From Swiss-Prot:
The keyword tRNA processing does not apply. One of its GO terms (cellular component) is nucleus. A motif (Antp-type hexapeptide) lies at residues 171-176. It comes from Takifugu rubripes (Japanese pufferfish). Its main location: nucleus. This is Homeobox protein Hox-B6a. Keywords: Developmental protein, DNA-binding, Homeobox, Nucleus, Transcription, Transcription regulation. InterPro entries: Antp_homeobox, HD, HD_metazoa, Homeobox_antennapedia, Homeobox_Antennapedia_CS, Homeobox_CS, Homeodomain-like_sf. One of its GO terms (biological process) is anterior/posterior pattern specification. One of its GO terms (molecular function) is RNA polymerase II cis-regulatory region sequence-specific DNA binding. The keyword RNA-binding does not apply. It holds the Pfam family Homeodomain. The gene is hoxb6a.
Amino acid sequence: MSSYFVNSSFPVTLPGPGGGGGQAAAESFLGQIPLYSSGYAADHPLRHYPTAAAVAYGAGTTGVHQDKPYTASYYQQTANGAYGGHRAAGVGVGGTTGAGPCDYATAAAAAAAAAAAATSFYRDKEHQCSLEEHQLALGQDGLHRKAECAGLGGKSLFGDPMDDKQSSVPIYPWMQRMNACNGTFGSPGRRGRQTYTRYQTLELEKEFHFNRYLTRRRRIEIAHALCLTERQIKIWFQNRRMKWKKENKLINSSSSSSSSSTVNGTEEEEKQTE
């Protein structure tokens, strides 16, 4: 078995005068070609254009050659698809004398058509959601998250808006109050003691003098008027009522003791007079 593999498109007989001359020409021609697995050298022009070689070397033969029953590989099919237009142009222009000029435009158009067909095939296999819709969804999600971050950026831990100056200034442990709600020295759940101005205390005392229990509507009005919260108004009135009860108890106890002392004094005076 010879180590030379005959190409499927290579002609069976070579041109030459007579049978002996043809065999001698074939041997001399085959001796000039190095033995590769594909039949041609890597840079040989006949390796890339087998049909042109068949036209060039099969012009003088009278016998009709038949193609080998070997199946074409994937690379040969790709080459046939890409250079089919070039081979057709070579046969039409050159005829039996040789291959025509290389038509790069036709080959490039065929390659582009094959790439477009492959792209459309794989695109049909993918999900119906297009790339533009996916990017639009991601962009909307990013904008929504940015809006949430921007809305929370200007609020403190309790939801109250804070100034840019306060947020930029660092707060150290020695700067915090002793009884702050999140201070270093105080307990974690302890709140700071609320201080009221003289004006606020005076207005609250006036309201307590007329009404010891406030309705929800009146509490809201006082809170807006004194720049306080409803919770602060409610706590102040609770503390004030407890203080008032203690004062009443002291007054009642003192009055009862005084009345009892007066009764006892009158009885003693009556006994002395008798």
